[in-house]
Curated annotation (Swiss-Prot):
Gene encoding the protein: lpxB
Catalytic activity: a lipid X + a UDP-2-N,3-O-bis[(3R)-3-hydroxyacyl]-alpha-D-glucosamine = a lipid A disaccharide + UDP + H(+)
One GO location term (cellular component): membrane
The entry's keywords: Glycosyltransferase, Lipid A biosynthesis, Lipid biosynthesis, Lipid metabolism, Transferase
Naturally occurring in which organism (per UniProt): Prochlorococcus marinus (strain MIT 9313)
UniProt EC number: 2.4.1.182
NCBIfam families named among the record's database cross-references: lpxB
Broad EC category: transferase
Disulfide bonds: none
Coiled coil: none
Gene3D superfamilies membership: Glycogen Phosphorylase B
Protein name: Lipid-A-disaccharide synthase
Its job: Condensation of UDP-2,3-diacylglucosamine and 2,3-diacylglucosamine-1-phosphate to form lipid A disaccharide, a precursor of lipid A, a phosphorylated glycolipid that anchors the lipopolysaccharide to the outer membrane of the cell.
Length: 392
């Protein structure tokens, strides 16, 4: 029997965790090895077969101010999880993204279980930040292996003394052939010639507050220009659905919110039919790129967090979208903090909706990006590495 603990948070982490769990189950079946999976994650990981010790999908936050409301719930959650892990020690630990919480957990588990391997899959993107190497040193102090998803990430951590395996980007495993565009449009109820705009605002509650009103206002302005423009907002979590609908209504947007379940079921249809996406920075940018959906990216945090990051942490980053970070160019339009207005979003969106040359330039950049991400079979390679490192 192998007992694994997988820890992640937020909607994107829950998705990546579920894909890894499915790959682990395939690998243990091949090895005829009984497997027990405990998880800090979300409903997708639970549906894939993990025992959910705590639902961390709604608990992500960026910034000191934004994280304050989560302090007490996080402490209560940690107390429950600590009790379970002391009663049922894991044979290996897999940390997925979710930097702050996973770094704290990694330090704790290294003290408690010095011989248990700790594997970081989808490590913090410190290669893209200008914080110095303090966080990297912390991470390496408890990590036995890093499974890198980007070549630049593998090089960064390897140069600093980590044992690293580059497995490729896990979204490659989800990019099958899209449905026929015309069939997808018919399934979604789109009329001939009608454009589809996706709004992708949030994997965290704070992002709904800071991003969705602006995205909705931009959608309303675009509908004034093109009255037939259809707007769809897929919800990342069921708890987001009401807030998303209220934001559309407040901006007088003619559109629909898909429930989290509908969004999962219709995702391939949405990507095949979409003409443009307006959304946050993060994993969703890579998903749009791999699916060939032109996009405009925005991000905003509280003024307090922005001030602290700029003046005290000396936070500097060339780009906020992973697409641009990896290509080292501004392929995807980005709007950050005060730049992020409805009018600026519209100005960036119009060429992508109306100028075929602009669209084709972005799609060509997507093709170049994909060539840097490895080959499919990513989660299977990660699962094999994890089980090879596990003490049985």
């Amino acid at each position: 029997m192998v007992r694994l603990l997988i820890s992640t948070g937020e909607v994107s982490g829950d998705l990546q965790g579920s894909l890894l769990i499915q790959a682990l189950q395939r690998e243990v079946e091949r090895r005829s090895l009984p497997l027990e999976l405990m998880a800090l994650g979300g409903p997708r990981m639970q549906a894939s077969g993990a025992e959910l010790l705590a639902d961390t999908a709604p608990m992500g936050a960026i910034g000191l101010w934004e994280a304050l409301p989560l302090v007490l719930p996080t402490l209560r959650l940690q107390s429950r999880v600590d009790h379970v892990l002391k009663q049922r020690p894991p044979d290996a630990v897999v940390l997925i993204d979710y930097m702050g919480a996973n770094v704290r957990l990694g330090h704790k588990l290294r003290r408690w279980f010095p011989r248990v391997p700790i594997i970081y899959y989808i490590a913090p993107q410190e290669w893209a930040w200008r914080f110095g190497d303090g966080g990297t040193t912390q991470l390496l102090s408890f990590t036995d292996r890093i499974l890198a998803i980007f070549p630049v990430e593998a090089e960064f951590y390897s140069q600093r003394g980590a044992k690293v395996t580059w497995v490729g980007h896990p979204l490659l495993d989800t990019v099958s052939v899209l449905p026929d565009r015309q069939q997808a449009r018919e399934r979604l109820g789109l009329k001939p010639g009608q454009r589809l705009l996706l709004l992708l605002p949030a994997s965290r509650q704070q992002e709904l507050r800071y991003l969705m009103p602006t995205l909705a206002k931009a959608a309303a302005l675009l509908q004034q220009r093109d009255q037939s423009l259809e707007v769809i907002v897929p919800a990342g979590l069921a708890s987001f659905e009401k807030s998303l609908q209220e934001a559309l209504e407040a901006a007088a947007v003619r559109g629909r919110v898909l429930s989290a379940q509908q969004a999962d079921e219709l995702k391939p249809m949405l990507y095949a039919a979409a003409d443009l996406a307006l959304g946050k920075s993060g994993t969703v940018n890579m998903e749009m790129a791999l699916r060939g959906v032109p996009q405009v990216v925005g991000y905003k945090v509280s003024r307090i967090t922005a001030f602290v990051a700029r003046h005290f942490l000396r936070f500097r980053v060339e780009h906020i979208s992973p697409v641009n970070l990896l290509l080292k160019e501004r392929l995807v339009p980005e709007l950050l903090q005060d730049e992020l207005t409805a009018e600026a979003l519209v100005q960036a969106a119009i060429p992508l909706l109306e100028d075929p040359a602009q669209r084709n330039e972005m799609l060509e950049g997507y093709r170049r990006l994909r060539q840097t991400l490895g080959v499919p079979g990513v989660t299977d390679r990660a699962a094999k590495e994890i089980l090879d490192l596990t003490k049985t």
